[in-house]
Amino acid sequence: MSYIQFESGREKDKARQELREAREAMLQQAKERAELRGQRERQKELRGEADWMLPALAKKLEKPAKKSKKNVSKHKSRSKSKSSKKSRKHRNSSSSSESSTSSSSSFSEDEKERKRRKKKSKRSRKESASEDEWVEAPPPLAADNVTKKEPPQRDDWMTSESLLLKTFSRERKEPAKPNEKAQQIDAYDPAKSGRELNPYWKSNGTGLPGFQKPQDDDERQAKPHSSSSAQGSSRGWRKPGAKAPSPPRRSRSRSKSATSSDEEEEEAVQQPKSRPSCLTDEQINELAGKAIKAELKGKKELAAELNQQLEAARKERAEFIASGESVRNANTRPAKSKASAEHVLLTKVDQSGNVRPLVQSGDPNESYGGRMGPKRGSKKVDTHVDGQRVRYFADDDRYDIKQMFEREKHATAAEVNLQYADIVSKHKNPNDDLDDIFADKVRKQISASDAEKREMQSAIREHEKLVATLDNCERCFDSAKLDKQLLVSLGDKIYLSLPWYMGLQSGHCILTTLQHVPCCTQLDEDAWEEISNFRKALTRMFAARRQDVVFYEIANKLHRRPHLSVHCIPIPASQGEMAPFYFKKAIEESEQEWCINKQLVSLRQKSLRAAIPKGLPYVWVHFGMDSGFAHVIEDEDRFPANFAQEILGGMLELNPNAWRKPRKEANPIGKVKSFAENWKKFDCTQN
């Protein structure tokens, strides 16, 4: 006997109404939080705190821009000087050609005078350049003591015009005789000639037909000649009933495209002009100060103009506050998005983290099918001849030993696992063991074009993932998401910044690379050396305050390409002695009992890059510059992301929410300024 359970409709409606009210309340709370967040951001922008940066860093960033401008100006000045020298030479040559035929003696004297002038100018430049050495000029000689030297007279044979060679003559060239045939060709008039076949030359025509006003239905009436000729000439072997397919008419699409382009132009013309940029509080105060100064100095016109600008800025500020936009959206103009083809070098990352370009086949026909490409049938290759093994794989004859070694070395673990899964999944005989499965698969030839296509598709996917991570990275120096008001010091490859949240201790800072690098084992030598210099400076700075320092880095899930970040946390000197024991015990108990790699690696006598192989995930802790520990992460999913923070928090007896749910810093600019004052004396980037 089955019992039917009835439900009341009122209870169902009541539950639905409660669910709707709960959803509306959640949406209202989220909306209020978003509005409050937007108001805070707008207030920061109005105060000028959104783009604030330390003045020392701003100057350092402005220097390369100034250097580039100076180089451009130097290049322009050099090109101008070269052109002026060329023009002078040209003038000298033209003046010498226009001058009359002078004697060789006068020419040689002019040359000597020019050389003397050059020597005098060089001497004067040297004397002006050397400021330390100077000598008083001798007093001018009396006019009586100066004896005038007569110029030397040359012999007659040196100045005789009969012996001189003529370099040019003043005689004009006789004009060439006119060519009779050329005159006849030039004198031909097609309008008067009776042999002219062009009818538009008759009756004083121009040789071209007159202008005819186009009609509106010209495009509809016009038909391509190719279609008419194709319709007229029918094939003899075809049936008479079959008609050739007529091409689709494109007149409507053309007219639509023309009208759409005209509408776009009209919209572009009718768009209102962009509003002037909204000024911040500091800029408005500066403008008001300039206006007051102009009034005090008695410059009435300038004061009136500045007052007008001030009133306009205040009006625009009121409109901006009423509109609810952000300063960046108001100042920036909408950029036109144009889809352009992008050429990218596809790369491949192996197990050790080395990046190599994707190698493609030399034959372009292998990547296409059809007659030019390889046949689809799977050919079997003989591995044994007369009972002796000749080859192991189907492509052994294609590659030599060096190429085979490179292919095996560059292959990744994911490709090997994929190949193994492919072999096992396609095998049908369950009675065969593993050796039989691989022996049958090896005898079949695998298409090289299919393998290359698979590699190219995987490389394209990896490149798309890399572009997405770079766009969303918050630590890359060129990224728009980087909060530059937290920067403290800037080096050649490394920069020092503070976290956006409240750290475990006052003085918590982060060392990061300018470029996107996943971990310290994949760094270049100069970048690693710069990190060690920053660590030494930070250790000295906190030692002056009687504090010890703990540096740590957790390089986990490297396939996601995280950005390198080495955290620096100061701790009291009394608890700094116990920190190595806490971390040693925690690292030994972090993984399972049986591990492939060594559980604890000491860094007292060797560096991190020599202790940990390239490409493996790891955690690294260093206590000042003396000693440290490293550990290779076995299970990446189970390893905690805040491993070092948990140990330090437990050692310092802090609240767990300090690292589990960190709170945002209320006054980041004040924190940056106080840290920068302590960092000035120990800054390693100023040398």
UniProtKB/Swiss-Prot annotation:
The keyword Lyase does not apply. The keyword Signal does not apply. Pfam families: CwfJ_C_1 (PF04677), CwfJ_C_2 (PF04676). Keywords: Coiled coil, Phosphoprotein. Residues 66-92, 114-125 have a biased composition (Basic residues). PANTHER family: CWF19, CELL CYCLE CONTROL PROTEIN (PTHR12072), CWF19-LIKE PROTEIN 2 (PTHR12072:SF5). This is CWF19-like protein 2 homolog. The lineage of its organism: Eukaryota, Metazoa, Ecdysozoa, Arthropoda, Hexapoda.
